A protein has these predicted regions:
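Short, solvent-exposed recognition patches
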Residues: 204-289, 303
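Sec-dependent signal peptide recognition
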Residues: 1-7
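Intrinsically disordered, low-complexity linker/loop segments enriched in Gly/Pro
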Residues: 103-152
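N-terminal leader/targeting segments and the immediate start of mature chains
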Residues: 8, 12-64, 101, 129, ...
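An acidic-aromatic
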Residues: 56-109, 168-180
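Gly/Pro-enriched, hydrophobic low-complexity segments
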Residues: 133-201
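A short, surface-exposed beta-strand/turn
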Residues: 60-61, 80, 153-165, 266-270
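Short, hydrophobic/aromatic-rich segments at coil-to-beta transitions
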Residues: 35-39, 62-68, 134-141, 162-165, ...
Length: 317
């Protein structure tokens, strides 16, 4: 608790710098995370205070981003990312599942293209000097202007503006996300020869391709009112294998926070999920309407999720 009071105190004590100057620092951080070449060890602390470590390397080669993240602890999972398209190699005993994901955004590249949208939903404060990964840094606090999102604490490298640490703090002053560089090295060249998986001939590789459907799939639902500051980022639909049923996923964002809404039919012999729970850094809220499961997931307050599921209207309602 004393730590949080201290963070709160330094957040407001650093207000001498103008707000426009502070937002300019965030712009510089966004550019640094995309344009610089760097590598290092990232530590992630979960809600049980367990630490998991990954090794990452990021290179901007001819204005294109290449990223590789390898797990150091546990199964040697691997993520390769080109621009915003990611491929995950997930070790599963005697086989490796290959999963694809579009529009991925991973630390330290966590900012939207324009920070103008962030200004609408967050106030910004200077949290003062710190030291992260043995480098001088400055903490910035992004505090929500309403009840629909959480607090973000960011530590930016003084020399390069690269984000070195991120903490997401909920309304109960609990840290729900905590990731930081343990060490950091800036690279002097744009070599991308490392951008490939190390294939294991002893294992079977399975591409987990979901049967994605086109945007022309008829939407039988609508969301009448979004929480303040959120807008649709992406939409996808897939058909269940062997079933004449379609599952929908819509992703919403305010620039920092993300919410996924899943809408899918519930078989007659299956009990739908309803109510609220928490899994890791994400809150989950589920409702059941007219034979369909509606579930919202995100690192945002539960009221934000419930406002979304409440406003999903099916065409037969």
């Amino acid at each position: 608790m004393l730590r949080f009071l201290f963070l709160l105190f330094v957040s407001f004590s650093g207000m001498a710098a103008s707000e426009s100057d502070l937002w300019e620092k965030i712009k510089q951080a966004s550019l640094a995370s995309q344009n610089l070449c760097y590598s290092g060890i990232l530590n992630t602390v979960d809600e049980k205070q367990d630490i998991s470590s990954t090794r990452m390397i990021h290179v901007n080669h001819k204005n294109e981003e290449f990223l590789k993240i390898e797990k150091i602890d546990g199964a040697p999972n691997l993520l390769l990312m080109h621009q915003t398209d990611a491929v995950l190699y997930d070790n599963d005993h005697d086989k490796i599942l290959i999963k694809r994901k579009k529009n991925a955004r991973l630390f330290p590249n966590i900012f939207p293209t324009s920070v103008e949208k962030l200004k609408e939903n967050y106030s910004i404060f200077d949290g003062g000097p710190f030291r992260v990964a043995n480098r001088p840094s400055t903490m910035f606090v992004l505090s929500p202007k309403d009840q629909y999102r959480f607090n973000y604490h960011l530590w930016l490298d003084d020399e390069s503006s690269l984000p070195l640490k991120l903490m997401v703090i909920d309304n109960n002053q609990k840290i729900i996300e905590n990731i930081s560089f343990a060490n950091l090295e800036f690279l002097s060249n744009e070599d991308v020869s490392w951008f490939r998986p190390n294939l294991d001939p002893q294992k079977k590789y399975i591409i987990n391709e979901e049967n994605q459907l086109s945007q022309s799939v008829r939407k039988f639902w609508s969301i009448e009112q979004l929480p303040q500051g959120f807008e649709e980022m992406s939409y996808s639909a897939k058909r269940y294998s062997g079933l004449n049923a379609i599952a929908h996923q819509i992703v919403f964002t305010d620039g920092l926070s993300f919410i996924s809404v899943f809408i899918h039919p519930v078989p007659k012999n299956q009990k739908p999920q309803t109510g609220s729970t928490r899994m890791g850094s994400n809150n989950i809220h589920a409702q059941y309407k007219q034979g369909y499961q509606i579930m919202a997931v995100g690192a945002v307050p539960m009221t934000t999720l419930s406002s979304l599921t409440d406003n999903v209207k099916l065409s037969n309602e």
